[in-house]
Design a protein with these regions (language model features):
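Hydrophobic residues within alpha-helices
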Residues: 16-17, 102, 147, 188
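Rossmann-fold NAD(P) dinucleotide-binding segment
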Residues: 51-112
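Rossmann-fold dinucleotide-binding core
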Residues: 4, 94-176
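Active-site-proximal catalytic alpha-helix in oxidoreductases
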Residues: 127-135, 156, 160-192, 201-215, ...
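Residues in the short beta-alpha loop(s) of Rossmann-like NAD(P)-binding domains
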Residues: 33, 67, 137
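Interdomain hinge/lid region at the active-site interface
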Residues: 161, 165, 209-275, 282
Length: 296
């Protein structure tokens, strides 16, 4: 078992850190606000007064942070105290350029960096079934693998630094586009009088089905838009994707439309609701909601 520092105890970080404790790892935890640290301490974690203090105790240092700015700031702090033999892994969704800067900062101190974004949401973190997309050196990946296995099920080394993040950005592009497409299709079905539960059962086993449909359509029906992944967070990811596509010369037609819809949703006060709340942008002009289908 390893000594693991975990920095960033949000909706993903807290259950991931809890899984590490359940697996028998020793966890040194830090978060900017105190309640998540206290909750983890009650489960057996050690409290750290700063990110640097947590990292100083870790053989493996994990971060799960909400914004590019927070990742940049934290890694500049961590690099100052990094030491040879440490492995740092960032589970945040950020730009490839930021991943490269983190790797360079740590390499100058003899430490190794893995970009290791995850997919599966808080439920996947709690169940230990996350997909972990890793970029970096094979030796560092193999050393960190037992740690990742505490919260991940599908764990892949995708290539060198940045490769894991590239795969995650492709995933997030599809998440954004699928969420918009499912919202549009579900509202059309409701306006045509189709029962949404029947739509889910039938299309869920047809070519039009997808993981995002299975995730979002039940939320359309229940009207539970409490955020697992918020509109604001996915808009952040789509903005990163937009910039990466522009710099790479890739036209982002569907992705651009999805980004505009998420931006509009934020402007309508939906920023902190779950991304499934995007459906409201179609329901209002259609004069119906997915849970109450009506024809005519």
């Amino acid at each position: 078992m390893a000594n693991v520092a975990f920095i960033g105890l949000g909706k993903m970080g807290s259950p991931m850190a809890a899984r590490l404790l359940q697996a028998g790892h020793k966890v040194y935890a830090f978060n900017r606000s105190r309640p998540p640290i206290d909750a983890l301490v009650r489960q057996g974690a050690q409290s750290a007064a700063s990110a640097a203090e947590a990292a100083a105790n870790g053989e493996v240092v994990l971060t799960a942070l909400p914004t590019l700015q927070s990742v940049e700031e934290v890694y500049r702090q961590l690099a100052a105290g990094a030491r040879r033999g440490q492995i740092y892994a960032d589970h945040s969704t950020v730009s490839l350029g930021l991943n490269k800067r983190c790797a360079e900062l740590l390499a100058a101190r003899g430490a190794q960096f893995l970009d290791a974004p995850v997919s599966g949401g808080p439920a996947g973190a709690q169940a230990g079934t996350l997909t972990v997309m890793v970029g970096g050196e094979k030796a560092a990946f193999e050393a960190a693998l037992p740690v990742f296995q505490a919260f991940g099920k599908n764990i892949r080394l995708c290539g060198g630094n940045g490769a894991g993040q590239a795969v995650k950005l492709v995933n997030q592009l599809l998440v954004g586009v699928h969420t918009a497409a499912i919202a549009e299709a579900a509202v059309l079905g409701a306006r045509l009088g189709a029962d949404p539960k029947t739509v889910l059962e039938v299309i869920g086993t047809s070519f039009g089905g997808s993981t995002m449909m299975t995730r979002n359509l039940p939320r359309f029906i229940s009207r539970d838009f409490s955020a697992a992944t918020s509109v604001r967070l996915l808009l952040k990811d789509l903005g990163i994707i937009h910039d990466e596509a522009k710099s790479s010369g890739v036209p982002l037609l569907l992705g651009g439309l999805a980004e505009q819809r998420f931006l509009e949703a934020c402007g309508r006060g939906l920023a902190d609701e779950d991304m499934a709340a995007l459906v409201k942008l179609w329901e209002e002009p259609a004069g119906t909601t997915v849970d109450k289908p009506r024809r005519g």
